[in-house]
């Protein structure tokens, strides 16, 4: 089979397709049509495998975009649905029942002791690490401000909206989201010595990777307790605003990806870590007045590192969404509070949803739903 392009340029044609309802070609919908597909020895009627995607990174993955404005009550996402001609906002408002999400994360001044979480029990830091899968809906983003309802959402929403049509109700897709605002690969990106993505550390007070692998394993255990066999089809990443311009970004990212695959190889397709996809996205390259971390040289170096990983010649399963304003990308915008982009670094409401749709379309186009 012809290899898929590693660097994904999703422009206006993609958006037109998505706004009409993203989907894989009907003739290519079977799991044996893709380069990464695997044959199962389990008869279809006895097959209890379910697809799992682990979402991680920093605040734009954690979900720092308003679906409803907490100050003036503007229904930003609902308005976008109407403007785009989509008449099913209630799906994302009430929950998509065949794509289930659990989430955990924090913004570094609060640390792991005060993480926002899907867990109904927030009495202790350990209790906050308890997974709680729910139909994917608005309000699964960061909320450390006591807002009720939670006004934020992340890429999980667009992913679920895009893939749900291709998911059996009795074999839901599970999204495990574990992401941390402001996080980078070295302690310097987190104030006051708070944790970073250094996977050599093994303490929740120091290592975000420790929290990621702990929360992921707990979530997989829950899926197994529900009678399913979880298969991690992809590691979905959005990070780089913290760490832009660091000369070792590519090395650090490769190590984190390799460590994650090694940690969860048992749950990979055919228990082969090389069959676990990696879905990344470039960081913002537009003209909004963001800091030096992701502008000019820092921004370019970080995106170049992402493209290098996505274009590995011996790997069919590394992908990078081109969200850039240049080079024919999606042109996603950030930082306009009136349009839903909380403070300086975060996607506006339409673009945060489009980002999720782009991840979802990658999943469909590359046959990652077995």
Feature-to-residue mapping (PLM):
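C-terminal motif of bacterial Sec signal peptides marking the signal peptidase cleavage site
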Residues: 18-21
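Bacterial signal peptide processing site
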Residues: 23-25
């Amino acid at each position: 089979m012809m290899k898929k392009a590693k660097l994904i340029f999703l422009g206006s044609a993609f958006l037109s397709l998505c706004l009409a309802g993203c989907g894989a070609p009907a003739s290519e919908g079977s799991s044996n049509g893709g380069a990464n597909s695997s044959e199962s020895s389990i008869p279809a009627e006895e097959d209890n495998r379910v697809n799992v995607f682990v979402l991680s990174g920093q605040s734009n993955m954690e979900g720092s975009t308003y679906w409803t404005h907490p100050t003036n009550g503007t229904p930003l996402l609902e308005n976008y649905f109407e403007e785009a001609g989509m008449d099913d906002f209630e799906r994302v408002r009430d929950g998509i029942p065949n794509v289930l999400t659990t989430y955990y994360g924090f913004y570094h001044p609060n640390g792991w002791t005060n993480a926002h979480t899907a867990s109904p029990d927030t009495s202790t830091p350990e209790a906050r690490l308890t997974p709680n899968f729910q139909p994917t809906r608005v309000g699964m983003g960061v909320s450390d401000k006591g807002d009720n309802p939670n006004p934020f959402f992340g890429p999980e929403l667009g992913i679920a909206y895009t893939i749900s049509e291709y998911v059996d109700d009795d074999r839901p897709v599970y999204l495990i989201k574990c992401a941390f605002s402001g996080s980078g690969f070295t302690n310097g990106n987190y104030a006051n010595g708070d944790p970073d993505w250094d996977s050599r550390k093994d303490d929740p007070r120091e290592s975000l990777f420790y929290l990621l692998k702990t929360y992921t394993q707990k979530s997989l255990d829950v899926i197994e307790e529900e009678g399913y066999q979880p298969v991690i089809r992809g590691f979905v990443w959005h990070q780089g605003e913290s760490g832009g311009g660091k000369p070792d970004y590519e090395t650090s990212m490769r190590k984190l990806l390799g460590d994650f695959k090694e940690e969860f190889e048992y749950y990979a397709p055919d228990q082969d870590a090389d069959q676990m996809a990696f879905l990344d996205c470039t960081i913002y390259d537009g003209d909004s007045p963001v800091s030096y971390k992701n502008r000019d040289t820092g921004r370019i170096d970080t995106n170049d590192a992402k493209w290098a990983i996505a274009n590995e010649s011996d790997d069919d399963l590394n992908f990078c969404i081109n969200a850039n304003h240049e080079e024919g990308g999606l042109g996603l915008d950030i930082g306009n509070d009136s349009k839903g982009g909380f403070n300086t670094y975060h996607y506006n409401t339409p673009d945060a949803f489009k980002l999720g749709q782009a991840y979802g379309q990658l999943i469909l186009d590359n046959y990652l739903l077995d």
